[in-house]
Amino acid sequence: MELLFLALLIFIMAVALGSGYPVAFALPGAAIITVLLAAASGYLLASDVSAYFHTGGPYEWISAGVLNLRGVYWEVERDTLIAIPLFIFMGIMLQKSKIAEELLITMAKLFGPVPGGLGISVVFVGALLAATTGIVGATVVAMGLISLPAMLRNNYSPSLATGTIAASGTLGQIIPPSIVLIILADQLASAADQAGAMRKALHKQVTGEISMPSVFDVTSTSAGEMFLGALVPGILLVLIYMAYILGYSLLFPKNAPAVENDEGFNKAFYMKVAITLVPPLALIILVLGSIIAGIATVNQAGAIGAVGATVMAGYKTIPENSGRYTPAIIVVASLIILGVAISNFDMNIKAASSAEDFLGIYIGLFGTAGLLVGIGWSFVRVLKVDDILNDVMLETSKTTALVFIILLGAAMLTSAFRAFGGEEIVKEFLSSLPGGFWAQFAIVMLVIFILGFFLDFIEIAVVVVPIVAPILLADPSANITAVWLGVMIGLNIQTSFLTPPFGFALFYLRGVAPAVVKTIQMYRGVVAFITLQLIALVIVGLYPPLVNYLPNRSSLLSEAAPPPRNPRLQFCLDQFVTDAIAADQGATMAAINAAKTISVDDMPKFIGKSIEGSTESAEEALAALAGIQIAADAVQDAEAGYRPQLTLVRGLEKQIRNIAEHRDKLAKQASRMNADNPERAEIEAEVAHMSDEIAALESQIPDNWEAAHDTFKKLTDAESKARNSYRRSGDTAWNDAAIILATLDATPAFIALESDLNALRPVLETAEFEVAEDAAKALERSFRDLEGADDVKKALGKVKKAMSKRKKDRETALKEYEKALAAYADQLVWRAAAETQVRPGVQVYLNAIKGNIGARSQEDLTREQALFLASCTSHHKDLSLNF
């Protein structure tokens, strides 16, 4: 019955919306009516008002609906909704002051005779507005107020115009900074933790190993990564829109005519372009940049946009005169003064102590006063000229009320959807779905698409994502990243906001569109853009580097980049080294052979052994590197026959685990019942049936499975062994040679200790034992910190021991001191000789292996390595063969 009322909920809502009933009342009305019908049916048919609810009853769910409704405007976590009226104010102010229209028209003129130029400029401006708001409602409303009148005046097809505006407005879902991306990042971070635990449990079940290698962990995400990941898909979507409008205008020129540029492309025109185009774009860039740089929150950026729009309106709404730009000039000059003060002075008034500190504060106060004067002057202007400020405030209030009442209705609808088990149905269905990751992923995308018909994007992010994301992220066969999943969900949510008849973007636009534009024209206009969004969704889905590359690049090139030894980088770093060795045309091998010829005559034994050990390890590393490819090819050859068996067996085992879990719950439930309870017998019979079902599934596992699994595991173990062997040899090759160079680099410090060493003799001869012991100890510590000075350090250690309280043997101490002097003299000789005899060859050798087999031993990645790894790690690597 819950399913019946869930279907009834959707049906009532569809009928109400289809009949033209206001959306603000259709959404909560459908929820309340369905809940009351379910309660009445339960009372009449089952004598229980809660009978036809998934959990709870009508009282609980109506209360939950009220709480959801209150949460739209009261929850601290949803303070970003405050930005909606601010950005609406900005858009309406731009429209009233004609700045936005001039911006769109000027950009269209720049395209000249290109058909569809105004539509293309609308997409571009829409993308910029989306980048400032990140909120669908505010962006769609702002674009509807700014763009639609201009397009209709230029004889654009109402369908193309409304479709372009609705699609451009929803770019706020995917173009950063976006509120939905921040929410998704938070939810996906938690989901990644759950998925990591699920993957570890799966690894333990199928392999029997207690711990899972860290390279198999689920990749989490952050808001910053989500912004970077969504940037390229957002730009891709904008380019697809522009290409479509251009193609459409070429096929149907009457529906998207070119905007004539009667002024011509002369110096005066370009000056007008600069005056018209630069200030609004600078405002948009300022709003977006303040968010990305972390200077302002979304709400603060909205305030910046509202004030900036007012300042520009202050000089646009009055006729040409000598003082037209005065308020704007004061604002810009004040900002420059504040920037200079902040950059050159400590502006903390509590910490100010010097005249210079107070000078900076006075400059800042002067700049602030100027800023307030300029802003206030602009507000007075727009208040006095045609009563623009009053009109803007009134329109902002009306539009804000429209947007928020839709959000309130969506909150009530969400409560009803939960009441009838919509969430649980989705979760259980997804968990039991066969067909592997991509079947599950397709279903999830479809579910999110459908839920987007009647759920706010925030509700989808906080309700649906926690349910489905852990299941998708935990699957080792796809091994997707959380940032890719988040961007895909963001693109999907954006698509669903355009879907007739329930797309919220359409309702937002309908609220501001003139009556001449029919609703059916809006529906017809968005169909093409829905198709374009689905194409973009498929492109991003098929090519994950579009999402993953920028976050990886940013991470690997940052100051906090992971070191080359990071386990997650090893597979791709091995590939980088393989390619580098293949491309160097034997230069590395030649460097190894040259290192073997370095003369170590009259050098201490450790130098010769280090060079010999390093070159041998380097040759072993090269051989192991070739062995990796052989082992990997063997795994790949065997994979074709092993993977179908693996997929079959893991699928059967998954079914067995699910049935066994359900069976154990029923068995536990039966054990708590009385023996004479008739339900116990039914449950026990069901438990027995499930046991038979498990046995039947186990019988389907091929008899040769264990042998096939063991054989394939030997191949994967051989590949792992080859990789580990290469890495050990490469590390040894670098470290052994690097010790020699570190020893020679310590020579200046070694020479600097000669005076201290000579000064120790009189101390040993005449000073108190305790004083002499401390002096020897300090000098020993100094030599201990130098590479290659062990023989001197050991002799000084014996000196210290002889002068200790227990020994107090001055004669022995002086003998050991003479040995230290002799060792020091010997070192001076061979260190001087090594500077010309050993250092050049070792330095050339280390330079030759630094970027390949010695890469793991470096402190940081080179730019070339980081870029390669960013590209390599952007692809999703199938890990299912290890599970």
Q: Whereabouts are the PLM-identified features?
A:
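Alpha-helical transmembrane segments of multi-pass membrane transport proteins
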Residues: 1-883
